Amino acid sequence: MTSATIPGLDTAPTKHQGLLAWVQEVAELTQPDRVVFADGSDEEYERLCAHLVEAGTFQKLNPEKQPNSYLALSDPSDVARVESRTFICTEREIDAGPTNNWMDPAEMRGIMTDLYRGSMRGRTLYVVPFCMGPLDAEDPKLGVEITDSEYVVVSMRTMTRMGRAALDKLGDDGFFVKALHSIGAPLEPGQKDVPWPCNDTKYITHFPETREIWSFGSGYGGNALLGKKCYSLRIASAMAHDEGWLAEHMLILKLISPENKAYFIAAAFPSACGKTNLAMLQPTIEGWRAETVGDDIAWMRFGKDGRLYATNPEFGFFGVAPGTNWSSNPNAMKTIAAGNTVFTNVAKTDDGDVWWEGLEGDPQHLIDWKGNDWTPESGEKAAHPNSRYCTPISQCPTLAPEWDDPQGVPISAILFGGRRKTTVPLITEARDWQHGVFIGATLGSEQTAAAEGKVGTVRRDPMAMLPFLGYNVGDYFAHWINVGKNADESKLPKVFFVNWFRRGDDGRFLWPGFGENSRVLKWAVERIEHKADGKSTPIGIVPTAADLDLEGLDVDPADVDEALAVKPEEWRAELPLIEEWFEFVGEKLPTGLKDEFDALKHRLSEEG
C-alpha cells in the first residue's frame, strides 16, 4: 500500500506538519492496514480492552474481585527489560560511555529500518501523543509513540497523560520526542495471530542527540511503553544534562511531622529494593504521616527560590507484583483494589482473581503465568518474579495533593540505597553535596529479577541509574557535581545512604523495614532541622541506636546496633571494588570523585 491508500492517514486530528510527515514516513515503511490517532478517551480504552480480550491477549478478571481489570500473559521470552539489547546511539562512542551498548547511529538506523519494513502488515498503526509530567507545566515534555500494540496504547493511557489533550498541547509546531515501537510480528492475509506477538530479534535503541527512541521486537513494559524508562530516564537524562536539571530513577515521598511540617524526600533505589513500598510508606511512629508523589521517576530542577524542586513525570504505577501484600504495602494493595488495572504475568485464581508469591492466601490451584495448571506441588513460581500491575496513580489513597503541581515539590533530602547483606549501615548522612554524589556514584546492590543477569551478585548501580543513563556515566557524575556547585549550598537537599537489607551472621534481617523505616526517616528529618545527633565515621555521619526513635518497636537493641555498625575491615574490602568501578568509568571520572575516594581511604587507614 502507498500512504495514500492507508486508511486513517488523511483524517488526522492535527495540523502539525512535522508529526504528519513522520507518521506518513513510518506508515509507508511499516505498511499497516490502518492508522489510528489515539484520543485517550474512556470509550477508546474500553474498545481496545474488548479487542484484546477477543484476541486472547487479555483475560477479563472477576469484576467483584478486580473491577474493570485484566490479566495479560506474555510470551515466556518477553518478560523483562533486555539490557543486552538496549543501545545508546550517539555520534561518538565516548558520549555513550562504558555502561551503555553503543552502535554508530547510521548503522543502527540501517539495521532497524530493514526490521521495520513491513513489520506492521495486518495490524493497526496507533499514533499515541503523550505528556510526561503535568500538561500545564512551564515547559511540558511531550512525546508521540507510534506502536502496533493495543497493549501499549491502553498501558500508555494509564502511565502518561495521553491523548487529545497532549496533542492539543503540541499545537501546530511544538517539539516532541519521536518514539517508534513495533512488536515485529506482521500478519499475512488469513494468518492467525498469537495472544502475545513479539519477535526473537529485539532492539531498544535511543538516539539522545536527536531525542528519538526506536524499539523493535518486544511488547513488554519498559521495552514498549516508551514514555517510561526510555523517555523519562534515558532521553530525559540527556536533555537534563544539556538544560541544567536532573532526570532520576527516584521515588518522591512527602513526610509530615506531628507539627504538620512537610518534608519532601527523593530516593534512588535499584529495581526491587522497595521503592514503591517507601513511596507508599505507612509510618509506625505516632503523629507522623506520609503521602505519595511518585514511586519511580523524579525530574528535578531549581526553582526561583534556589531550592531543588521535583515532579513525577508519570501518571500511573507500573509496579512489581511479587512481594506486594496487605502488610508490606497496604497502600499499593488499596490502589490496585480500586480497579482499572492491567496485570501482566501474575497467576489467576479459580474465581477470576489474581495471585502472586508473597500475597496473602494459600491457593491450592491456580493458572500460572505460562497458562498452565499450578498447585503447591508444582515446584515453580506461579507468578513471574518480574510480573507487574499497571494502575492509575489517582487511585492511591496516600496521594499527596501536590503530586500534579506543575512547579513540583521542594526536596529536603535525597536518599540513595541498595540491597546489601553486609557493610552498609541502616543510614549514613553524607558530609556535603560532593560526598553525597560519591555515595550515589558508588552505590552497589545485589541483582534482582527486574533485569537480566545473575540474581544475588553485587553490581555497581550509580544513583540506581546504571540501566537508564542516556550518556556517559562520567559526564553524568560531573553533571551532578556541577548541579551542586552552581547552587546555594544552604538550599541543597541533604544526602543520605540507606540499607534496609543488612543481615546478621545467621542470615536474619537486622531491621524490620517497611513502615518501621519511618523511624530512620525521622532521624534524617531531625538532622535537616539540626535536632538529632550522629557519630562521625569514615563513611559519613551515622546515628547510634539511641539517636533513633525506637519507642514501641519490638526489636533486639543489639540487632539495631549491628544494623548501624560501621566495620572498617568490611569497608577496606569495599575499596578495591570501588577502585575497579572507577577504572571502568574511565577517563571521564570527575576529579571530585577521585578526591572523595582518596579521603575515604585516608579516613579508613586512620581507623587502624
Curated annotation (Swiss-Prot):
Binding residues for GTP:
A272, C273, G274, K275, T276, N277, R388, R419, F514, G515, E516, N517
What InterPro entries does UniProt report for this protein, alphabetically? PEP_carboxykin_GTP_CS (IPR018091), PEP_carboxykinase_C (IPR013035), PEP_carboxykinase_GTP (IPR008209), PEP_carboxykinase_GTP_C (IPR035077), PEP_carboxykinase_GTP_N (IPR035078), PEP_carboxykinase_N (IPR008210)
Gene Ontology annotations for the cellular component aspect, listed alphabetically: cytosol
Query: Quick one: which residues bind Mn(2+)?
Result: K229, H249, D296
**Gene Ontology molecular functions:** GTP binding; manganese ion binding; phosphoenolpyruvate carboxykinase (GTP) activity
PROSITE patterns hit by this protein: PEPCK_GTP
Report the pathway entry: Carbohydrate biosynthesis; gluconeogenesis
For activity, the cofactor(s) needed are: Mn(2+)
The covalent link annotated as Isoglutamyl lysine isopeptide (Lys-Gln) (interchain with Q-Cter in protein Pup) occurs at K485
According to UniProt, the reaction catalysed is: oxaloacetate + GTP = phosphoenolpyruvate + GDP + CO2
The record's EC number reads: 4.1.1.32
Q: What class of enzyme is it?
A: lyase
Keyword Magnesium applies? no
Q: Where is the active site?
A: C273
Give one GO biological process term. Answer: cellular response to glucose stimulus
Which first-to-last residue range defines the signal peptide?
none
Alphabetical list of CDD domains matching this protein: PEPCK_GTP (cd00819)
Cofactor binding summary note: Binds 1 Mn(2+) ion per subunit.
Superkingdom classification of source: Bacteria
Instruction: Summarize where substrate binds, as residue positions.
Output: R81, Y220, G221, G222, S271, N386, S387, R388
Give the Pfam families listed for this entry.
PEPCK_GTP (PF00821), PEPCK_N (PF17297)
Function, as annotated, reads: Catalyzes the conversion of oxaloacetate (OAA) to phosphoenolpyruvate (PEP), the rate-limiting step in the metabolic pathway that produces glucose from lactate and other precursors derived from the citric acid cycle.
- What does the subunit comment say? Monomer.
The UniProt entry's sequence similarity note says: Belongs to the phosphoenolpyruvate carboxykinase [GTP] family.
- Protein's recorded name: Phosphoenolpyruvate carboxykinase [GTP]
**What organism is this sequence from?**
Mycolicibacterium smegmatis (strain ATCC 700084 / mc(2)155) (Mycobacterium smegmatis)
Lineage of this protein's species? Bacteria, Bacillati, Actinomycetota, Actinomycetes, Mycobacteriales
